[in-house]
């Protein structure tokens, strides 16, 4: 890198980069280089001084600035050199300004306003030529980063017009300010009679009236920039593979583009260190607590004591599994400007990697087409190069309603996409953009915006009416099924028996938007279904999309979103690319997971729909280990990682050995046995990487890079057979899988590609392949997301958790408690299936690249449904204690009191510290605690039994799609209780504990003051359960949110039966009873 003898300096935190002269010789050379150069502010030639030397404004870096600009900058600007930021010193003949040092040896006041032979006064310096950067509206860094000899903006931050003569200058309003490059304020710098012109009030006005003609501004500006780039000196950085040799980018921009695209932000030590210390302290307290509990049994209630101790031990193990993965939480920050500097260069095609976006839907009646349409529209309007985005919609229900709705969506996208990109609309899902109560005029300066917004809102309302009409028509299905417009029967009339369907709506036949711009590709996909084939539900649909996209577009990165999760931040793909395309750390990242945020939830969030504790605490903790788990939506994948390849390994340097010692010497702190074990593990890893090496080996063979004596044809055929056995029998798809960086085969006709795409979504394509086993979304559980992420982490990949300030995605949450419990039931059922399968993280994946703390998190994700058994038993103990007068602990001593207080205090303080570093409110934390109990005694319990029946007895459970919110009114059904058997267990527990409290208080009143002491512990125990089940109590007592009568009746009946049964077979009452004797008294 040639720095011209200047010293490189900068600040990473302040995002600054400058070049400073290192010695006087370099400064002299820089001064000599000024001869014949032009001012980098106004483009006038730098004049000579009286001594015949070029005028030098800055003695530190000799940045080329003419005398008038120097004087104006000292008077109206920031009085500093644009390049090195050194304050301009007062030169001979220059007027004094505020802040100048007292100097007696330069000149006197008589010459203070003389400029030598120039004869130019301040009243002759044009205001139109240079306006203070403080009023420009451009960021300061635009000028601060200018290098020596490079083109930097005028002080007005405008551009020069090449058509204007050298003695006249025009301010060009940049397009980013809405001026579209029009010329304003022609002024003369040589004629003092020309007055300075003010800024126009309306820059968008046709400026041909100012006398400059109507020549296309864009053509003239491109020509001017080309000429200027030929004249200006360019500082090139040699040897950088990310920048081509012919780039004319200036040095500071190049340096900025070479910096990392993201960085880790560890939690402050003042927050995380007390948290870690408390975790260790809590472990010690737990040890002392269990030591006391085990050594002090309750003799008259031994069964209660034993059951309670077993439950408490399980809760402690569950807490350890949940706690230690949060040991090292981190946050991350991305730099979108650096991404643009590195991969988006002016005048060249964008270097950003293509992305294929997958949207999955099943039933349009439960997943309204309008919601799916908004998701698709937000994807098509994303802030990303249109030729690098392809949207694939999987319709696993083969519904003609979805097909027709997508057709209407493609037509409306021709208007919506250019509107969003023209006015930088956020969010870009029209339903949420038009319904949100916000100041939509904020930062909008274009006068036509209001008019076009009204027209667009009217167009969207018409679009909604069309979609609603389609939904109404779909309610009445014809007896013979649906037909197309030409009378052909709709292929998907039979949901379980239909051929594969692919329809490319946008991006293929030259369909453009209303402004004649290209649109992203939009493809409808419905895979083939036939009786007798296992279609693997959502996982099978996603694998079909992988293969279709690999044939049609083959982008190296994939984004997966549910049909109800729209893109809320149009720069979401760029946020992910800051990690994926980072040359330093991006190669080992398998996916970037975004948090789930939701609309349609009230601020109280009674049923913990937002799940804030998981997304803002647990996921940040996992990000500090090997990365967050995959949650099923809002995730950007690396295609090669989904193909089952191992993560690239870093080359390790040579290790130190002790060859000078005999083999029996153990000074190397090792043994033969350990070395042998490591060798076995290394051989196992080597075998796991053979598949990934095949691809690169096959590429080498195709390019002719093979070893001497090898049989090219045999090697190619053998590897091709292995790849076809792994990926399937489609040669086009196998060829695309070999391309690590994506891309399409040359000279491939659309007809051939479409034929191959139909083949890869056929029913039998996955037979005798590794799809669903080692490739793509993994089969074997209804929660395929956990298995898929676990597989990739086991191959040594790491994931990243990205939390931009503006939520990347937003979705619809379950409307009421019943739907919420059914959603949790499905998640828990999937965890039970994984726990009982060969992919259980307790015994699967050893010897790979999975870190042990990451393994703990996966174990916790599949073990948590089993906590429902001890939880429901433990929540029943308070009622039993109150009904029988027994308790799970003996009389408490002072030592025991201290232990209990220390344990409860550590639990509370741990929660407080988690809320502090996770930035979670106490309401969200408490709702999460409540729903942990509610879900644990209901959905988790049912999932446990269903999972055991499914795995052990083969009784399959149907997957129920969670209903998405319709637009029937804000929070209309949010607290509506619907009939479901999931509500009976928690309701029964609530009634039993309420009965127990009533019985206990009545007994204490009857027995007097001495009974209140032992009662306090039992009451506290029962109230703890009642408070956690408070939403049910409110539903039982409230008028608006009343619980269904059938649930109340069943719960009361069950509670009464259990209470009477306990009274009948009370194990704590002596079986024999008292011996009656005749006392001789006549008792009446």
UniProtKB/Swiss-Prot annotation:
The modification N-acetylmethionine is found at residue 1. InterPro entries: Cellulose_synth, CES_Znf_RING, Nucleotide-diphossugar_trans, Znf_RING, Znf_RING/FYVE/PHD. Interacts with CESA1 and CESA3. Interacts with STL1 and STL2, but not with GOT1. Binds to CSI1 and CSI3. Interacts with PAT24/TIP1. Its cofactor is Zn(2+); Mn(2+). The gene is CESA6. Residues 450-476, 675-703 form a coiled coil. Its main location: membrane. It holds the Pfam family zf-UDP. Pathway: Glycan metabolism; plant cellulose biosynthesis. GO terms for molecular function: cellulose synthase (UDP-forming) activity; zinc ion binding. Glycans are attached at residue 958. This is Cellulose synthase A catalytic subunit 6 [UDP-forming]. Zn(2+) 1 binds at residues 39, 42, 66, 69. Binds 2 Zn(2+) ions per subunit. A zinc finger (RING-type) spans 39-85. Its EC number is 2.4.1.12. Residues 1-277, 322-868, 916-930, 1002-1012, 1064-1084 are cytoplasmic. UDP-alpha-D-glucose binds at residues 360, 366-367, 396, 537. The active site is at residues 396, 785. GO terms for cellular component: cellulose synthase complex; Golgi apparatus; plasma membrane. PANTHER family: X-BOX TRANSCRIPTION FACTOR-RELATED. GO terms for biological process: cell wall organization; cellulose biosynthetic process; cortical microtubule organization; multidimensional cell growth; plant-type primary cell wall biogenesis.
